[in-house]
Regions:
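Short, solvent-exposed loop/turn at the beta-strand->alpha-helix junction
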Residues: 35, 59-65, 86-94, 116-121, ...
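Conserved hydrophobic beta-strand positions in leucine-rich repeat
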Residues: 53-55, 78-83, 107-112, 136-138, ...
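A structural signal for leucine-rich repeat
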Residues: 68-72, 93-102, 123-129, 149-155, ...
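Alpha-helical scaffolds that organize eukaryotic protein assemblies
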Residues: 110, 121, 127, 131-169, ...
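N-terminal/domain-start segments enriched in small and hydrophobic, helix-friendly residues
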Residues: 274-292
Length: 347
């Protein structure tokens, strides 16, 4: 009996833990290390478990990060999540840079969202450690400037996905750095980067022609110069133009050349009329989500046009506040778009 118990503890339980752990949140998987010495050995020896380090919203994230990266098992880390780890500071990244033997060469994605105590110096330090980074999210770190973009473009040459949402001090200078260094960029989010102008962002659109996802939420200063340039992005599938108050039907007609669009948010694009939406209907025949929320210049005519081209694909349609559309009850909309399951994008 004792021998059977010994086999159970030494072999069966660790094997079960090894099978279960990849399906658990990382924090739960880490807790399994304390079950027994045998579980510890088996789990530590599984490299897949240690490709992600999730310190989201944790207390003392800087000290935890330094401790974790000192361990051999995190030598091949691919994803580091520090989102809302608000006590992380420049000094933690600078300390990592100065430590011998610390390398993040395998890191592919870094999430620093809302780490408000990070400055340009912190960005310089952390990006110097991860030259092969492919995705970087620095949402709502309002103190960052174009200097951070300079550090990112200098240290991380392979970025494909860049989220700058809420970085209000980024200017056209930063956009030019992106345009000149990331011509293979796939995803860009510049929500509320309010210092940007047509001139700077046009350079991005001209040089980053592989863009698939573009989020321009709450950027009311751009004009049709930018929107017409978007029409040249042949691979674009996601476009958020919420609050683009200067977008006209002419600009939207150019965007209709993006035939692969599946997501288009035109909420509060107040200059748009049926003319622009009909152009979208004719050019973008694979739309799955479309928001026309708050546009008073559109009528039932644009929905008729959309139903001819997108009834087979559209699952989300928001026409709330579109007072020119008279037949906008759920029943009316489902008659035109049988696959609709969502009728509100914005609450």
């Amino acid at each position: 009996m004792a021998a059977a118990d010994d086999v159970w503890c030494r072999e069966t339980v660790p094997r079960v833990m090894e099978l279960v752990s990849p399906r658990l949140p990382q924090r739960d998987a880490c807790a399994l290390l304390a079950v027994s010495p045998w579980c510890y050995r088996v789990l530590v020896a599984n490299p897949k478990l240690w490709e992600v380090l999730d310190l989201r919203e944790m207390k003392n994230p800087g000290d935890r990060l330094i401790s974790a990266l000192s361990l051999v098992r995190y030598r091949h880390l691919k994803v580091l999540n520090l989102e809302f780890a608000q006590d992380i500071e420049d000094r933690h990244f600078i300390h990592l840079k100065e430590m011998s033997g610390i390398s993040l060469e395998d890191l592919e994605f870094l999430n620093l969202n809302a780490c408000q105590k990070i400055s340009d110096k912190g960005i310089e330090a952390v990006t110097s450690l991860c030259p092969n980074l492919r995705g970087l999210s620095i949402y709502w770190i309002v103190g960052l400037s174009d200097s951070s973009i300079g550090h990112i473009t200098k240290n991380c040459k392979q970025i494909l996905d860049l989220n700058l949402s809420g970085c209000k001090n980024i200017s056209d200078k930063g956009m030019r750095l992106i345009a000149n260094n990331y011509q293979g960029l796939k995803k860009l989010n510049i929500t509320r980067c309010v210092k940007l102008t047509d001139d700077g962002f046009q350079e991005v659109l001209r040089k980053c022609s592989s863009l698939e996802s573009l989020n321009l939420y709450a950027l009311s200063s751009f004009t049709d110069k930018v929107y017409k340039e978007i029409g040249s992005l042949a691979n674009l599938t996601f476009l958020d133009l919420c609050g683009s108050q200067n977008l006209t039907d002419d600009g939207l007609a150019c965007i209709s050349r993006c035939g692969g669009l599946t997501y288009l948010n035109l909420t509060w694009c107040i200059c748009v009329t049926d003319v622009g939406v009909v152009a979208i209907a004719q050019g973008c025949r694979s739309l799955e989500l479309l928001s026309l929320f708050g546009i008073v210049g559109v009528t039932d005519a644009c929905l008729e046009a959309l139903s001819k081209s997108c009834s087979h694909s559209l699952t989300t349609l928001d026409v709330n506040g579109c007072i020119g559309i008279k037949r906008r009850s759920r029943d009316d909309l489902i008659k035109l778009f049988p696959l609709l399951s969502c009728f509100k994008v914005h609450s």
